[in-house]
């Protein structure tokens, strides 16, 4: 099984090209099921979850051609299966996003209950409740969600009990082909939801309120394929910016989207980083200084993203001062903390809050990745730890970061993939 071997590295320096956003690409690929003609998606990152999504679409009978250069073409003319099996779904929670498109277009869907990162209860009840309000008959048995609808789904007024990105996306796709108007209140406002909505609009969907907490979808009878470019990955961007801050370096992230990262940029500036942005680039310069501790509380967008919490734990571990990090989105999302403590970090957990006293340096150790973003934090810690750090189980990392070791090497880091 692959590992990453990391030696203490100089301050990161240079340019890094940001990949397409995994969390936008996955729902957009699933939206291909809604299109009656060929659908071409570009800027798709080369990741394990993307490969799983393509396998899932092929398993349903869709023709999926990887055209190279991050382009994927999807044709549904031969789609004739409506079951997303356990062996595919267990590795990727986003497989649940096939439910809305299959049900809306074909009236039937059997989807295994999902797997993915082990970061707490991420219930699918919001997805199911919304679809039931649109007229679907759903039962959960033998580990599968079995959903049926006679004719078309019906427009409905849906209030989400809690903000859920996945449920918003599933219901948005389902509503695009429903009969009548659907209103989704307390909808997620994440940039990836906006990207999916813009893709659906390019396919012919009628959606208003994009980017707000109230989405209105006037269902249409059919959607056509289009060509659509996936937005840049804001979490990958943020991860490299934090790595540069921790190593006291200076980097530029190219093909990025500064507008989607305002809360992260604000916290990096609080930590002492000098940040300059253009339309599609972000430059961070620590001017050789140690970062200052910053308090973090995760929240749905436009608040601070839970997917950047682990990386800021590392920043605070090596910062001047004391900080608290409070996780409000997922429970069980501090699994990186025991690993960082093994490297010498001074941190303790109290419920959903981590209290961190900054120290000057860490020691290299063998550590284990437990989920996608935790693994990124361990890599960043390894860059500034004395000696050698080995990160095990990096298949988590490969689910969300494209060519991570090559990108770090390009910035001067001593990172290599080993068996």
From Swiss-Prot:
UniProt-listed Enzyme Commission number(s)? 2.5.1.7
Cystine pairs: none
Pfam families under this entry? EPSP_synthase
Annotated binding of UDP-N-acetyl-alpha-D-glucosamine, by residue: 93, 307, 329
GO molecular-function terms, A-Z: UDP-N-acetylglucosamine 1-carboxyvinyltransferase activity
Gene3D superfamilies attached to this UniProt entry: Enolpyruvate transferase domain
2-(S-cysteinyl)pyruvic acid O-phosphothioketal modification sites are 117
**Keyword Cell wall biogenesis/degradation attributed:** yes
Residues at which phosphoenolpyruvate binds: 22-23
Q: What is this protein called?
A: UDP-N-acetylglucosamine 1-carboxyvinyltransferase
Recorded source organism is Shewanella sp. (strain ANA-3)
What broad taxonomic lineage does this protein's source fall under?
Answer: Bacteria, Pseudomonadati, Pseudomonadota, Gammaproteobacteria, Alteromonadales
